[in-house]
């Protein structure tokens, strides 16, 4: 009988301790940081990395912008939006292209596909895909 009483006492105290250690939802709040993709050469805080990424992306688009010859000659203009994702390995994958004609769309896609391999975005310590959209305005000024 003593062994049974001792066993019940141990079980009840361990259950009580387990409840105290668990706490409530307010004490167990989980916050996960989202880290944006990192362009080669960018570093610092998350804000600095994000600002550097945007600056480098703009610089990349401007330096790789090529107006297709045929569309330029025929004064074909338009706005093209390229949707893409930066995958978990840091490579760009085109997910969609809208606007403009095929020539303008191809030029915009080629520009985006020239983005170098990046350090992928992170969430909770794991690489994750980041979706993005970039508009291209093709104007001949003729």
Task: Put a short name on every predicted segment.
Residues 5-6, 16-142:
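Charge-biased low-complexity segments
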Residues 11-14:
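N-terminal signal peptide c-region/cleavage motif recognized by signal peptidases
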